[in-house]
Amino acid sequence: MDDRYPGIFIPRLNKIQNRLPDVPFVSQWQEVPQDLICNAEDRECTDTTKHCQCFHVVKVPLNALVELVLVDVRPTRNADSDPPGVPPPTHIHHPFHLHGYYFNLVAQQQNPRNVTPSDIFNMVETGDIPLNLYRSPSKDTVGIPINGFVVLRFVADNPGPWFFHCHLGNHAVSKLYF
């Protein structure tokens, strides 16, 4: 959701809505304007009065261990303050798919209480969320539980640009990918 447009869903990863370049990145990456490319480290998108949109690229060193924590932030509905016509929150799983790799699903939970994504990131970092690091399932697509999260791990041993996106058609069209 975007605070400037109540009731309108604007999907974002790391507070960035992706914008594809006019040329295919896989084959013509040299032609992508550098000022279009960004990631969460070089573009701070914390101001909700601004719509942060760019070609969201995360550069990962070869053979690095990558850990992704994906959190489904479920919008809540307040009948007293929501403008008329605001639709109720959706109740769907987000199936995320990674091209070029298989990842290990090391944790998957519904949010047992109302905690923020930052709380979940901190709990993963401090070990308060147990990770299944042995015999965890290997996948290329995972469903994020409604109002829940997943923790994924893989080794970046297949160099090149790879697409990571929500597999729901309307979310892909609305740019829920990087």
Q: What name fits each language-model region?
A:
Residues 1-178:
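Copper-binding active sites and cupredoxin-like electron-transfer domains
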